[in-house]
């Protein structure tokens, strides 16, 4: 929970995920040139932060000392992922759209890569930067996120993954 600057894990450390949940899967297009598959998940998630966290925020209590809790009220979240594989493409195109009606929650897409590397790349205002995958011991932010403008990427000897996005300026390895 939190906002675009500060993220706080809820006290129950509950992660709500599509992993292991039933999905609607349909083949939207299939021809000699490409195949498009659509995967849809409907999940019930807390509608926002709980009353205690709201009170702490209104009292301007230091965010790093706040105790986070979630609302008991649930709202539906729709997650649609479209997989496109084209005959001449060098990789699989993945487009995920999330209809998020919940407030004050972080929503992320996770891409397990199986890559073995200690570095990754991301764009910044005027360059592509190389960063270590793990922060050093002096890193005090409870969130391990990094900033980017349009993409983050990593690779090893066997392959790689580039995630390009619009409107989301953070990522975590």
PLM regions and their residue ranges:
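C-terminal (or distal) subdomains of carbohydrate-active enzymes
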Residues: 1-173
């Amino acid at each position: 929970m939190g906002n675009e600057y500060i993220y706080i894990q809820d006290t129950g450390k509950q992660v709500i995920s599509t992993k292991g949940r039933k999905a609607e899967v349909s083949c939207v297009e299939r021809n000699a040139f490409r195949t498009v598959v659509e995967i849809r998940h409907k999940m019930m998630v807390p509608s926002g932060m709980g009353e205690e966290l709201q009170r702490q925020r209104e009292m301007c209590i230091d965010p790093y000392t706040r105790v986070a809790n979630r609302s008991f009220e649930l709202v539906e979240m729709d997650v649609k992922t479209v997989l496109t594989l084209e005959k001449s493409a060098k990789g699989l195109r993945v487009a995920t759209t999330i209809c998020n009606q919940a407030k004050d929650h972080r929503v992320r897409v996770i891409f397990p890569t199986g890559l073995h590397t200690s570095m990754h790349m991301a764009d910044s205002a005027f360059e592509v930067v190389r960063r270590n995958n793990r922060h050093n011991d002096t890193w005090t932010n409870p969130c391990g996120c990094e900033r980017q403008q349009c993409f983050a990427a990593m690779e090893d000897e066997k392959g790689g993954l580039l995630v390009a996005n619009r409107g989301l300026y953070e990522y975590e390895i």
